[in-house]
């Protein structure tokens, strides 16, 4: 089969980067991560990120661990709500639903139109799965989710809210809590210090006032946003959902523990009343 050529600098290349991290993690640490969709996609495309060394190793571990964390939360929610909606906010080419699908849940994948176009091309829609092209800040997407409170709903976002301003996130989260009672939201976040380094590296044209972008220093501030939040908890991104693998090595595991302890790498879980 002829492989699809992925052009440098394209939307496809950007969306494939997180999958590359998971692919490399599976190759370096067999048995620790499992993403068959990721492997299949990379067998069908021709692309070379040319990333080697310690930074590739760190990026691969972090990308795969983040998916593991978010999948763990979704899987736990589905135990009590097997017919739940599973909503992927800013989905890109994320394949988490295939890791947690119980045969009853319904998936909704949300992203900008260009990202959804790539997703439709490389992944398509499967049974009980709907791809929705939208702007997350335009809350009209709420009405496209076939939500039934008795069935439940769980939202997850992987590497998404770093690029949102705090007021945008507050508006979105509070509206979600009102519209989807009994639901749950899980996402990754960092402190203001970590966000400053991240945005200066990734967003050359970001707002000069980096402080307006979303980060989580004090969990109490996030809790105060809405009386419709029943709980807000924070766990370590790298250590919160399972122990570190000894194969990562002493030095990297020490670094990972520090990142979690200092709250530079966080997973936030919000439960709606």
Predicted features and spans:
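Rossmann-like AdoMet
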Residues: 1-87, 91-134
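Short amphipathic alpha-helix with an adjacent loop that forms part of the alpha/beta core around
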Residues: 140-150
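Conserved beta-strand signature within the Rossmann-like core of class I S-adenosyl-L-methionine
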Residues: 154, 176-192
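A short, conserved alpha-helix within the catalytic core of class I
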Residues: 163-176
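Short, glycine-/aromatic-enriched active-site segment of Class I SAM-dependent methyltransferases
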Residues: 192-210
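Short alpha-helix
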Residues: 210-236
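Conserved catalytic loop of SAM-dependent methyltransferase domains
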Residues: 229-254
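Core SAM-dependent methyltransferase catalytic element
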Residues: 245-273
């Amino acid at each position: 089969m002829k492989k699809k050529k992925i052009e440098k600098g394209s939307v496809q290349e950007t969306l494939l980067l997180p999958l590359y991290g998971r692919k490399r993690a599976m190759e370096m640490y067999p048995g620790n991560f499992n993403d068959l969709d990721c492997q299949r996609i990379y067998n069908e495309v021709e692309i070379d990120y040319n990333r080697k060394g310690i930074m590739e190793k760190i990026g691969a571990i972090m990308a795969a661990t983040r998916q593991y964390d978010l999948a763990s939360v979704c899987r736990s929610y589905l135990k009590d709500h097997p017919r739940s909606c599973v909503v992927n906010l800013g989905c890109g080419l994320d394949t988490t639903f295939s890791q947690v699908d119980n045969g009853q849940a319904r998936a909704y994948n949300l992203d900008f139109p260009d990202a959804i176009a790539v997703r439709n091309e490389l992944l398509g829609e499967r049974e009980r799965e709907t791809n929705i092209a939208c702007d997350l800040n335009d809350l009209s997407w709420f009405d496209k989710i076939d939500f039934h409170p008795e069935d439940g709903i769980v939202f997850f976002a992987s590497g998404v809210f770093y690029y949102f301003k705090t007021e945008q996130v507050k508006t979105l989260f509070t509206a979600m809590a009102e519209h989807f009672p009994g639901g749950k939201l899980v996402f990754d976040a960092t402190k203001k210090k970590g966000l400053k380094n991240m945005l200066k590296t990734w967003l050359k044209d970001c707002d000069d006032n980096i402080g307006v972008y979303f980060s989580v220093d004090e969990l109490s501030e996030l809790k105060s946003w809405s009386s419709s939040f029943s709980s807000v908890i924070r766990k370590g991104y790298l250590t919160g959902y399972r122990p570190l693998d000894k194969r990562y090595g002493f030095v990297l595991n020490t670094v990972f523990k520090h990142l979690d302890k200092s709250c530079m790498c966080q997973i936030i879980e919000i439960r709606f009343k």
